[in-house]
Amino acid sequence: IMEKDMTKGSPMRLILGFAVPLLFGLLFQQLYSMVDTIIVGHYLGVDALAAVGATGSVNFLIIGFCMGVCNGFAIPIAQEFGAGHENDLRIFVGNCVRLSAAFAVVMTIVVVLLCRPILQLMRTPENIIDGSYAYIIIIFAGIPVTYLYNMTAAIIRSLGDSRTPVIFLVLSAVLNIFLDLLCIIVLHMGVSGAAAATVVSQAVAGICCLIYMKKKYAILKLAKNDWRWNRGYALKLCNMGIPMGLQYSITAIGSVVLQSAVNGIGSDAVAAVTAGSKLSMLMACPIDAMGSTMATYGGQNMGAGNLERVGKGLKSCTILGLLYSFIAIAVVFVAGRQLLLLFLEAGEGAILEDACYYIRRNVIFYFPLAMVNIVRFLIQGMGFSRLAVFAGAFEMLARGLAGFVLVPLFGFTAVCFANPLAWIFADLFLIPAYFFVRKQAERMLRTG
């Protein structure tokens, strides 16, 4: 059995042991997304690439909400696992499955109907809007599949096993690349083929996780009673899931506003920011892994009523975040230009310079970004996910401010400082919020 109890042993060792498989999965996802981009660009041309790219922020808005909801649903499961309450854990799992199915059906219907108006609202250029629609409608029709994979993976992670979901993710990404080539080159399905490949391979990963859960975890063998609708349990799941989903979406709205502002500067700026953002996302993978780790660590230790360990875990993870920030700065300042050539041609001198300027301004602020992820996910894991939504709102506010006010005044330089501004805004809220949560949690544990 791969369950891992994070309430005992060295916090630093546990955090590293849990974060490394997550990091591998995140890096693999980035790698796969790069290969996907290369296939679409190479075989379908620049318009098809732009059509898929134009759906990026709205895709993150909706799919991010699904992922957030599933991660939130898993927090009460992690808490019951930490507390050793197996019966309660099973009732949460039963209600989690029912709620995920309901969310998936409702969201699919609403989003598929609103798909084209959303693209028009985002001022998607006329020459690519049909391609964008053909791509995103299939992705959105596959929302139930997104819920299946993210729900099962989040439940497995909440029991302390971060490795298994990553293995299935890697298999699914390899399958996705094969299906991309099949649908685009052999079946000539265009951008629709790329979308279909994504949905089918994610379905395979979800089914694998489901079978694994049923086979491997005795703790997850649900009796008839566990499947019964339980209003109290369902409410607790929604109280965790919906705020986490909203937090992803709120952050995405800020990015949509900023993207519109960048679009206004011109296509060279768009190309520079796209390349810079891709490298930044790749470099930030270890920070994302630290965040997800703290959600499970915080959940299990809060469930076990061990606040002292929560504080120790935060300290260990902050040290890791600081160390990694220095490594990232060194890598970007020494090899940033070479790394950007993964996404840009060497001949595009001016764009390359701008992209380099962008990534350097971002990486200097990786420690504030690390603190955003570590503290936000820890607060969520401890069961205070509504507070984390405010952090998302602070980020949205900062990106909106940059998009509406600073970019018109200072142009490209303002774009480069928009993310750092968002991270600092979020930290100004999150760090005091942690001490507030800590006091609340102490009071809750005292009164039982």
Task: Write out the residue ranges for each language-model feature.
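Transmembrane helical elements of multi-pass membrane transporters/channels
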Residues: 17-36, 138, 172, 201-205, ...
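Small-residue-rich hydrophobic transmembrane alpha-helices
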Residues: 49-109, 146-165, 272-336, 369-383, ...
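Transmembrane alpha-helix boundary and packing residues in multipass membrane permease domains
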Residues: 22, 26, 38, 75, ...
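N-terminal transmembrane alpha-helices
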Residues: 6-43, 57-72, 76, 101-108, ...
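Interfacial/gating helices of multi-pass transporter permease domains
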Residues: 40-60, 126-131, 191-192, 233-240, ...
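Short alpha-helical transmembrane segments in multi-pass integral membrane proteins
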Residues: 1-19, 77-142, 186-242, 298-365, ...
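Short runs within selected transmembrane alpha-helices of multi-pass transporters and secretion channels
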Residues: 70, 139-157, 165-173, 194-209, ...
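Helix-terminus/linker motif at the lipid-water interface of multi-pass membrane proteins
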Residues: 27, 31-49, 119-126, 182-189, ...
